[in-house]
Amino acid sequence: MPVYSIAESLIAWLGDSGHAAYHIAPPAEDAPTEFVTVERTGGYVADKVDHPSVAIQCWAATDTDAERLAITIRNLVELGARPEGVGHMAINSGPYAFYDEETRMPRYQLYVDIACQLTD
């Protein structure tokens, strides 16, 4: 039985929505002007349903653009069609500024609570 990856599903879903999305931020020289990273940060399983908590980080050249991208992603989560295998998505917190000291690139983050299948 194949394992369902919420991170892979969200990355594909965001890509299909026109947003460059990755597990890990690409090197600065290879990165698009705006992109999104997706990371499962926790969660639990109950009654054969996976309930992952996911951090979505929105990166851009300026703080304003990073915030706008985060708001766009927030609206997609709340108002858009769900990725295949996902029954529920809701913003837990964010978007909020989450500046990256290492790359010095503006970044906003939001946390999403999800209910999804355990397997494909």
Describe each PLM feature range.
Residues 52-55:
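Short amphipathic alpha-helical segments
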Residues 1-46, 64, 68, 75, ...:
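Small/polar-rich, solvent-exposed N-terminal microdomains that initiate assembly or binding
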Residues 1-12, 29-30, 41-49, 89-120:
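Short, charged interaction patches at domain edges and termini
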Residues 36, 60, 95-99:
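Charge-rich, low-complexity amphipathic helices
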Residues 57-59, 115:
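Short hydrophobic/aromatic beta-strand micro-patches
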